[in-house]
Amino acid sequence: RGKGSEFFGVVVVNWLLTVITLGLYYPWAKERTLKYLYANTYLENDRFQFSGTGKEMFVGFIKVFGMFLFLYLAFLFAAQSQNTALSAIILLLFYAFILGIIPFAIHGFYKYRMSRTSWRGIRFGYRGDRSTLVKMYFRDLFLTILTFGIYSSWMTIHLRNYTLSNVKFGSASFKHQANGDDYFFLNLKGIILTYITLGIYSFWFQRDIINFYFDHLSLHHNDKKVKFKSHLSAGDIFELLIINLIIIVFTLGLGYAFAEVRTLTTMFSKLQIYGDIDLDAIQQTEAEYKNAFGDEALDVMDLSGVI
């Protein structure tokens, strides 16, 4: 139920303070953004709440920034020494660090973001095991490299199935049960038809991906469940992307806030939740978690798509 004009005020203040503070305000800007978006997202006329703080995210931001700064300075030193071999080693270590930190960042993201998300006073939570996720990630990464990217569809589904199936909403549990084969052929069809139609099919392709993710998600409690069903159409995607592009281009980027609100409004308005769970019977079971390292790591690396 957010309004572009209201969110625009949040975004402009965030931009100004982030620039003035040379980026240091960014975690607090992120806090204000998430709190606005959560507070304007409703289920059965009750809003969601984000209780994370800029201070928590700033600590995570500093940790991530420090790691990247160390690697950058090491590479800069190697480059200035004109030692080609050392520069190559540092560069390889940098890329290895990026690939290696992803599963830890995903785990940390879910632990923090879920514990800071609530509805009707009931917190979400994440019960996944870090070592299990790390082993799964590196196994699938190896197979993806070995198959020149073909296995990436199975890797994506394995990660989504594991992480989302370990998300809790109080005493209720989420399940994401998708098949890598189905996802592979969905992507294969989408890529081929998008290429043949010179990009026109991309709207149907994006619709299929989004609907696939939602349609395999469910929430379970006391032998009862609710399922998620997305009714997003290719026309919805086309209208959303074209109008958002026009808004952003003709406002020189200032219309980002309006585009973001339009996107979330469209996505949630097309999402149906149906089933027989008694939401009032769900009880608080999840503890707080204040380490925002994973949340900031995914943000800094712009890898939110992996979740």
Name these PLM-found stretches:
Residues G2-F7, V11-T84, A88-I122, Y126, ...:
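Transmembrane-helix bundle segments that line or gate the permeation/cavity pathway
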Residues G4, T53-G66, D129-L146, G180-I192, ...:
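Loop-to-transmembrane boundary segments
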Residues F7-F8, E56-M57, T132-L133, W154, ...:
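Short loop/beta submotifs within extracellular cysteine-rich repeat domains
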Residues V11-E31, Y137-H158, I191-R207, I242-R262:
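Hydrophobic, aromatic-rich membrane-embedded alpha-helical segments
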Residues K30-Y36, F104-R116, S152-S165, Y201-S218, ...:
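Juxtamembrane/interface segments at transmembrane-helix termini
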Residues L37-S51, R113-L133, Y162-Y183, N211-L232, ...:
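Juxtamembrane inter-helical linkers in multi-pass membrane proteins
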Residues M57-G60, I237-L240, N244, V249, ...:
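Membrane-proximal intracellular helices of multi-pass ion channels
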Residues F70-I98, I210, F214-D215, S230, ...:
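Membrane-helix interface segments in multi-pass membrane proteins
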